[in-house]
UniProtKB/Swiss-Prot annotation:
Catalytic reactions of this protein: 1-(5-phospho-beta-D-ribosyl)-ATP + diphosphate = 5-phospho-alpha-D-ribose 1-diphosphate + ATP
Name of the protein described by the UniProt record: ATP phosphoribosyltransferase
Keyword annotations: Amino-acid biosynthesis, ATP-binding, Cytoplasm, Glycosyltransferase, Histidine biosynthesis, Magnesium, Metal-binding, Nucleotide-binding, Transferase
SUPFAM superfamilies linked to this entry: Periplasmic binding protein-like II
Cofactor: Mg(2+)
GO-annotated biological processes: L-histidine biosynthetic process
Catalytic activity, EC: 2.4.2.17
Family: Belongs to the ATP phosphoribosyltransferase family. Long subfamily.
PANTHER family registered for this protein in UniProt: ATP PHOSPHORIBOSYLTRANSFERASE, ATP PHOSPHORIBOSYLTRANSFERASE ATP-PRTASE
Phylogenetic lineage: Bacteria, Pseudomonadati, Pseudomonadota, Alphaproteobacteria, Hyphomicrobiales
Matching NCBIfam families: hisG (TIGR00070)
UniProt-listed InterPro entries: ATP-PRT_HisG_long, ATP_PRibTrfase_cat, ATP_PRibTrfase_CS, ATP_PRibTrfase_HisG
Amino acid sequence: MTAPFVLAVPSKGRLQENAEAFFARAGLALSKPGGARDYRGTIAGLDNVEVAYLSASEIAANLARGSVHFGVTGEDLLRESIADADRRVLLIDGLGFGYANVVVAVPQAWIDVRTMADLDDVTTGFRAQHNRRMRVATKYINLTRGFFAQHNVVDYRIVESAGATEGAPAVGTAEMIVDITTTGATLAANGLKVLDDGIMLRSQANLVASRDADWSDEVRETARVILDQIASRARASKYKEVRTRFAGCNEALLAEAHKRFGVVSPFGGPTSSGMLTLHCPPAQIYGLGSFLREHGADTVSVASLDYVFDKDNPLFSKLAAFLRQ
């Protein structure tokens, strides 16, 4: 029996809910035949897919090992835990949830420290005065080392943090921190501020592929189907379908509509009877409808699109190119 295609998704909380909703919108409903507490699942209509419910950090580790084909996890975890991440995994697509920034934060009382260059000066002075290096509390050890090296900050040492990193300066276990934040409210509540150029990484949940997984022909075909579904849903979300028919509908009018409203005519120009189907950005719907009526249309209908399939599959092309490298 051919080994299954393994998709790893978060096992709890909002990340799990958002991941399941994302796949459901693409027509890829995840289910747990063994019940809510089961850590294995399936996708309706894809018999050779096994869904593995794991923590976000476990997903990153399994992508690195090649024991899953696709995984949903944050870019911050990939960059932190996988050496040479761009060679070993592919960020296929950002999923639009799980947004957070990895940042350098210092006490608000450091009024003269606003940039990494200022921090370099302060760390150098701190070592000269105290005969020890300034401490940085973080769980992002590799990201911190890389970012500080880019800014030529060397007089520091990392204090590994297991949790509640933002409290480290207040309790005296570190002078500053590198941590992940969404709004910055928790940092501010702990008397910290983000440096002006201290955003190390703008992260979100991504659909990620592993280079080291077993990419058999059957598995690649499954990946193509999954990515085709996702791409068709993304394409559909950008447009509404507009339909009309009137005698004055011609190629010149269509060209003007393309230029003014950013429409796409997926089935070509108007038919001999003046029938026209357009895909229009939602923000331009009223303007387009008014334009068509001004030029003779009696009725213009607008409908939502569920999926728009195209001969091109840009997400799968991206994956195929990555696996060829």
